[in-house]
Every structure is written in structure tokens, then in C-alpha cells.
């Protein structure tokens, strides 16, 4: 039987002996499943050591904390990014994506601030979004009012869009130089406009092919408690997308969120927003973060696309 996976991902799945896929029964089972998977990856493959050439500083800010990254040989003229980690608004954190942020800071030659936003279900919407806005304003003051590249993965990509749009709606569009959204959530499945529903099939097609299964995504939305049609969560519906300066989106072809990326690109194109877009057929959600040797070229290509986008926005 022909595999839907790209060759390098297929090699990883064969070696691992399973397709990484979170159970979706409830939040406890998701957290347990993710913990087990992360432990297996660490034991069998190991995660690369952090890049110590990138300097870090932790900052406490009104109940949340931030980690600031500065690449080697920084001059103070580098672009500034604000990064939101993934995890369906309920898990993950700055520490979990520290290595990834160090790579972004070095490869993109940018000063980066990673946000430890509050998680659901303990803090429901709009807690994480409010934290994003607070972090953006803090980063602005720290880095001489330099416009920010708002960046994020998965739910973090959603927060990057939401924070940018909230700033725009608060007459602070000048604080945003662009959005870098990696496999982002852009719309609640129940909020997809009727005329676009035929194009929104990834939740069915990729339900069990990716770490963020269809069932897990439902749990994430249920925990976050954002209204289905809220325009800072279902950002596809926001009436002022045309105010976004520049946007980069990375799509993973076997992701439940594949069509979130595609529909957002279509909406941005209609609004005549400058867009860079990279698609990776045959790869599932966050494939660029998994530590397996066959995925090295995929990871380098993926990060190269991110770096190119940051240069374009700077």
C-alpha cells in the first residue's frame, strides 16, 4: 500500500514503529500521550543540545515570563521577533521550544522574545491573547520601538495572528512588521464560511495522520473556550486582514490544519496582503521539530523558508 508520507517522514515512522498521534479522549489523556511520546523521542533519538552561542535572558512580566534571545555578534540592528509556542493553548512552553527559538534567533539573525503565556483550561480565552499583547508592548519598549515580527507555531501561530490583529484594532499597526505563522490555527471548524466548506477537508483526510489528531483539536478548542466566531481566534473571519503588512505561512500537507493555512492565504490574497507561502506535502504537524536524522534536510529547508521570510519583513 502506498504511503501518504514523504519519504523522510515515512522512514521516521517506520523506525519509531508508530505514527505519532495524540489521543483525543480528554485533556488528561492528551497530556499523558504527549509526555509518553516526548519521552520516547528523547530516549531513542535525543534532542540536540541548546545552541549556547545564542545568549538568553529571562524576564518576569506581570504574572508571565519571557525569554529573550540574542544571536552572537548582535549589533542592535537586528529584527525583533515575538514568538508564541505551540501546544493547542493547553500545553507546551518556552522551555520546551527553547532549542527551536535558539535556532530561529541564530539562523534569522534576530532578537527574539518567547512568551510563556497562560494556558487553558486554567486560564481561558482571552487570557493567552492578552498576554500576547502585553508581551508585544513590553518588547516594543525594550527594543527602541522597533516593529515586531509576530511568530508562532500551531496555536502559537494563531496567537501571532490574533495579537497582530488586536494591535491593529487598537491603532497600533505601526508596531507590527509582519506575521510568521507555522502550521497555524486560523479558524474554528464550525466557523468556516459556507462557501469555503468544500475546501476545508483536512480534518477528515488527515484525522489520524498527524500528532494533532482531529479529536485532539476538538479538546483544544473546548478547553480554550473562545467563541467559535471570535475574530482573534478564527482570524480568517477578521474584517481587517488587509491591514496586515506582510505574512508568511508554512503549510504541512498531512496536517489537520492544512486547510487553515490554505484558506488564510486565499483571504490574504483577496485582501491584497503581501504573502510568502511554503507548502510541504507529505509532512504532518510540526514535522520540522522531530529529532530524526532522515528529517534533517526537511528541517533545514523549513528553517530556511522562515529565515527568508524574516529578511523579507525586515
From Swiss-Prot:
Pfam families: Abhydrolase_3 (PF07859)
GO biological process: aflatoxin biosynthetic process
Motif interval(s): Involved in the stabilization of the negatively charged intermediate by the formation of the oxyanion hole: 85-87
UniProt EC number: 3.1.1.94
Pathway: Mycotoxin biosynthesis; aflatoxin biosynthesis
Catalytic activity annotation: (2S,3S)-versiconal hemiacetal acetate + H2O = (2S-3S)-versiconal hemiacetal + acetate + H(+); (3S)-versiconol acetate + H2O = (S)-versiconol + acetate + H(+)
Record bears the keyword Hydrolase: yes
Gene Ontology MF, one: versiconal hemiacetal acetate esterase activity
Active site (record annotation): 154, 255, 285
Keywords: Hydrolase
Domain of life: Eukaryota
Function: Versiconal hemiacetal acetate esterase; part of the gene cluster that mediates the biosynthesis of aflatoxins, a group of polyketide-derived furanocoumarins, and part of the most toxic and carcinogenic compounds among the known mycotoxins. The four major aflatoxins produced by A.parasiticus are aflatoxin B1 (AFB1), aflatoxin B2 (AFB2), aflatoxin G1 (AFG1) and aflatoxin G2 (AFG2). Within the aflatoxin pathway, the versiconal hemiacetal acetate esterase aflJ converts versiconal hemiacetal acetate (VHA) into versiconal (VAL).
Family designation: Belongs to the 'GDXG' lipolytic enzyme family.
Name the record gives this protein: Versiconal hemiacetal acetate esterase
